[in-house]
Every structure is written in structure tokens, then in C-alpha cells.
From Swiss-Prot:
The lineage of its organism: Bacteria, Pseudomonadati, Pseudomonadota, Gammaproteobacteria, Enterobacterales. The keyword Hydrolase applies. SMART domains: POLIIIAc. Signal peptide: none annotated. Keywords: Hydrolase, Metal-binding, Zinc. The keyword Nucleotide-binding does not apply. GO terms for molecular function: phosphatase activity; zinc ion binding. Pfam families: PHP (PF02811). One of its GO terms (biological process) is bacterial-type flagellum-dependent swarming motility. This is Probable phosphatase ECA2529. Zn(2+) 3 binds at residues 73, 101, 131. Its cofactor is Zn(2+).
């Protein structure tokens, strides 16, 4: 099991069912040392209000040995790569995941999806691209992997894509893992948990990683320190409270 989960949702996204406290308890039981709460960006219909993200500064950084990252799953809005995490919000989050969601960016064609995803990476705010294997948003996988390596953005293997949502993702996810491996890029693992019991469940992601012989040192989730070093390399300030995780 990997000790870090970088994608999950709380009741602040109203189609999810657990609180921050629920996740802390589950993390302690599963020996998860660091997780990121990444509720949906405000352009989604049931997303938290802008104030939710602006007030995340009240969250503790460390609770009973479990580190907490303040995150967002932002929406890619257009072919120019705009996302719905801008201005003062950028100063309140530690980790920015960005991805396509149908209510914000209706599926179009492969070239448009590829251009929008690469533009998002090039803009420099997103650290991770969420569920890039979604078959409703086909992309040029090789081009995406090469751009991610160029811009130091991690592509996500999303465990939920194999079991609950985005059915038909598995062939794309395998191809993405292979392409990222060959491009020298990074992968991020996300449970995409919408209820605390799913925290840290990477069962299907781990199977893909083994099948393609993906290098462990290029998976962010191998340790809290690996994640924190990556975020600092990307220009985020060091988080003193998490230094000893």
C-alpha cells in the first residue's frame, strides 16, 4: 500500500459522503501518512463555494500523525487551458489537480482535448492532471505524456476509473502509464474517494503499474517526502509542519 492519497472528495462536494474528520480516522487505520482533500472547483454545479477554498487556512496541517494537504480538483474550462482556480485561491491551496468534467467542458474531439490539456499544463498552475484516461475525452496519449514530462506535471492513475466511474478507462490508463514511463514523467495515484472507506485504495492502479513495470521512483505516492519535494520543486512554499512526515 502507498502511504499517500492525492485525490478525494468530502461532503463539501455534495455528491460525496465523508468529512475531513472521517478521512483522518480512516487514514490512521490504514497507515496513510498524508492525503490531499481535492474537492471540485467552483464551476461544477455541486462544488463548494469559493469561500470554502479561501478558508482552508483554518485546517490543521497535522492531526495525530496524519498530514493534510489543502487541494482542489479544478476544472479545465476551455482550449486555452484556463481552470477555475485563479487569483487569491492559488495562494490557499497546496496541490492543484485539473481535469475534464462534462458539465464544465462538454466532450469534443481528440485534437481539442489534447490541446486543452497541454495548454493547462503549460500555464503552470496545475500539478496533476486527473483521470486523463477518461474515454469520453480521448487525447493523444503520447503527446500528453511528453508534455507532462516537459512541464513537470504528474498524470494520474485514478482507481475509481476502473470500478465506479468513467467505464472503459482501463486500456487508456495502461497506455498512459506506458507513455509516461517512456517519456520519463511522473504518475500520481488517486483513489478519487467519495466516501472515506475508499481512502488509499489503489488496487487497480497497482495492477497496471506492475503490468507495465513502472519505476517506483517516479510515482509521487511512494512517500510524503516525495510529494512535498515535488510541490516545492513546482514553486510551492515548504510546509514546516509536515517536514518530519
Amino acid at each position: 500500500m502507498y502511504p499517500v492519497d492525492l485525490h478525494m472528495h468530502t461532503v463539501a462536494s455534495t455528491h460525496a459522503y465523508s468529512t475531513l474528520h472521517d478521512y483522518i480516522v480512516e487514514a490512521q487505520q490504514k497507515n496513510i501518512r498524508l492525503f490531499a482533500i481535492t474537492d471540485h472547483g467552483p464551476d461544477m454545479a455541486d462544488a463548494p463555494h469559493y469561500w470554502h477554498f479561501m478558508n482552508m487556512r483554518v485546517w490543521p496541517r497535522l492531526v495525530d500523525g496524519v498530514g493534510i494537504l489543502r487541494g482542489i480538483e479544478a476544472n479545465i474550462k476551455n482550449i486555452e487551458g484556463d481552470i477555475d482556480c485563479t487569483g487569491p485561491m492559488l495562494d490557499q491551496v497546496d496541490v492543484i489537480i485539473a481535469g475534464f468534467h462534462e458539465p464544465v467542458f462538454p466532450p469534443q474531439d481528440k485534437d481539442t482535448h489534447t490541446a486543452a490539456m497541454i495548454a493547462t499544463m503549460a500555464r503552470g498552475d496545475a500539478h496533476i492532471i486527473s483521470h486523463p484516461g477518461n474515454p469520453k475525452f480521448p487525447v493523444d496519449i503520447r503527446a500528453i505524456a511528453e508534455a507532462a514530462a516537459k512541464y513537470n506535471v504528474a498524470l494520474e492513475l485514478n482507481n475509481s476509473s476502473f470500478i465506479h466511474s468513467r467505464q472503459g478507462s482501463e486500456p487508456n490508463c495502461r497506455a498512459i502509464a506506458e507513455a509516461v514511463r517512456d517519456a520519463g514523467g511522473l504518475l500520481s495515484l488517486g483513489s478519487d474517494s467519495h466516501i472515506a472507506f475508499s481512502l488509499g485504495d489503489f488496487t487497480h492502479c497497482e495492477r497496471i503499474l506492475q503490468e507495465v513495470n513502472f519505476p517506483q521512483d517516479r510515482i509521487l505516492n511512494v512517500s510524503p517526502r516525495r510529494v512535498l519535494d515535488f510541490l516545492e520543486q513546482r514553486g510551492m512554499p515548504a510546509i514546516a509542519e509536515l517536514a518530519d512526515l
